[in-house]
Amino acid sequence: MSYNVNTIISNTEALLKLRHDETLTTTTPQRLHDCLGTAVMMAINETWTTSKKNRENKRKAYYFSAEYLMGRLVYSNLFNLGILDQVKAALEAKGVDIADMEDIEDAALGNGGLGRLAACFLDSAVTSGVPLSGYGLRYRFGLFKQRFDEKGAQKEMADDWTHYGDPWSYRRDKHAVKVKFADQTVIAVPYDMPIIGYGGKTINTLRLWQSEQPGSFDFAAFDSMQIDKIAKDNVRCEGISYALYPNDSTEKGRLLRLRQSSA
């Protein structure tokens, strides 16, 4: 499969202008990553769609994991498509070093060997032509950052990996489903991420689910100034996919882990 690098770079420039009124040389690494990722997603869309259609009504395999560590997708995806060197050269010709994106955070969807193992299974399957789809949760804070306070104590900080956008996933609202627990109902919204096989001929899918509150904004509660209730309800629903492996030393923590494993 051949992908047009000039088109990808042109689309990246157009997206930078449209979204940020910037150019390749005036933008930030985060914005460049976001727009380049979107341009690549545009380029692979036909192949991704064809891969899905070719496997309709055929036997498929599914991989379930609590976590996935997919690595730096801008590099791995361009490499698997066979255009990493060409994109690097095209950016350099316009005064941009692709290495500037090396500090872009990985998708924080895991924190250990289990996540890397899951990613390796997906990579191996798609490169071998096996129709394997991955399923899991789309954590907002899958990992955490660490720092030391003034007393030298280690502190954990949230790692909001989607703060600058997530160009490698598509939200699929039409496939959202209700998940009913004994004491609450949430909406599970899927986000699809392409898993590109080496050579770019086949693309599988990693579908990650994000927990959200059902229904629309509660204006009645807002008008009566029950803002704490609104916030509490939101966190209770969205908290299921907030973080990987919540503290299970309390009853609430154990219940949250149970919800995650059954969602």
Question: Model-predicted segments: where are they?
Answer:
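A conserved ligand/cofactor-binding region detector
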Residues: 1-263
